[in-house]
């Protein structure tokens, strides 16, 4: 829930890009919950194998960059790497692989869309570019103007991700959906549907949100 609160706080001050990065994290959390609901302990074991391999990889990275350590620390670390060399055989997890064949598989499309804003892509950096001056030199706007439609889209996606988490946790607990949760889902669908109406004449692929 800390992510949700942070998204709201960022939205209130117009930090859309930063909010979208956190919404992306919310979707990733929903993938894990959905997979846990689907595969239970089997997925828990996959998570453990993933963590083992990543720990060894991080350890190997320290040696590759020849970071300076105290002799005793380096000796213990090398021994740890030797004792856990079998951890390299584990499989690593990816968001796309985790969400595959789960109840929220289609939401990976939104995650992929948000991933553009989580990296220094040309799309992301273009937010800060101003038209070129008379000498052909582009300008930089460190505080680009807020785009209300993008902020609304971000909050809409955040609601979608949070609902996925709530229903996933409900499945993990093997509980019946509460009336409050059902009402929230119905309200979201109604708002999302209403938000699409003004954009019926837009080009295919665009989404309207409310």
Locate each region found by the language model.
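A cross-kingdom marker of C-terminal helix-rich interaction/assembly modules
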Residues: 1-210
């Amino acid at each position: 829930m800390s992510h949700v609160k942070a998204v709201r706080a960022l939205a209130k001050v117009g930090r859309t890009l930063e909010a979208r990065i956190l919404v992306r994290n919310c979707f990733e959390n929903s993938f894990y919950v959905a997979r846990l609901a689907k595969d239970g302990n089997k997925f828990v074991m996959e998570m453990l194998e993933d963590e083992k391999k990543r720990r060894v990889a991080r350890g190997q990275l320290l040696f590759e960059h020849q970071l300076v350590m105290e002799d005793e620390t380096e000796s213990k670390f090398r021994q740890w790497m030797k004792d856990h060399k079998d951890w390299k055989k584990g499989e690593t997890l990816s968001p796309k692989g985790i969400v595959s064949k789960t109840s929220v598989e289609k939401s990976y499309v939104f995650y992929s869309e948000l991933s553009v804003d989580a990296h220094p892509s040309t799309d992301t950096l273009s937010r800060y570019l101003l038209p070129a001056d008379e000498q052909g030199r582009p300008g930089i706007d460190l505080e680009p103007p807020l785009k209300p439609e993008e902020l609304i889209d971000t909050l809409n996606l955040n609601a979608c991700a949070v609902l996925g988490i709530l229903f996933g946790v409900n499945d993990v607990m093997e509980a019946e959906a509460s009336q409050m949760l059902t009402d929230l889902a119905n309200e979201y669908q109604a708002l999302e549907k209403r938000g699409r109406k003004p954009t019926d004449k837009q080009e295919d692929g665009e989404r309207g949100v409310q």
